[in-house]
Amino acid sequence: MAENLGDLYIEDGQLMRIFQERARQEEPDLCALDKNGNLVLFELKRGEVQGDTTIQVMRYAQSWGQKSYYDLNEAYAKYCDKYKLPKQELKEAHKDAFGLDSALDYVQFNREQKMIIVGSSSDSRLVSAVDYWKAQGLSIDFIPYRIYLIGDEYYFEFFSKPYDTHVNPKDRKGIIFDTNFAYDENSIWDMFLSNIRLALTDL
């Protein structure tokens, strides 16, 4: 899941992955940098979790938030070794990843931290905890995922807010009526693209 999440953000050009959790270590599952050099920490939770995940990711943010550029550069070097990536100093790799005209200065790295918890869309306790800390001003967010079984294969999706809290979409059914289909079968798609829910006209 960490691989897929990292690939999702990298494809969008939003983040640069610099670290992935080592087995049996008290570490975030994934660390990345944004365009401004700020650190983004991901904690992935499978199914509904027991305990306080938000406090756990705060501990990670406290620990990693104190790391210097040189600490991050060392972590990135180990990440490159592990995944057989070309060796490059972090600030130069960051410049290339985001297409910057010049590399950031050392002091511009890790000035701010953002915590992201990735969890099941049905875990209402976790969603509530994240919403609470966000309301207190913490830079924390929740990314929901949902797992599907199609045939003999499992699929999962990450999706954006607003999101529902049901494990399976079939638990909440909806019906779309296209009363204009006989006149213009493509008009419904134009309405979707324009965020139009209802269109009325005189007969």
Task: Annotate each language-model stretch with its function.
Residues M1-L203:
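Charged, terminal alpha-helix-loop-beta segments
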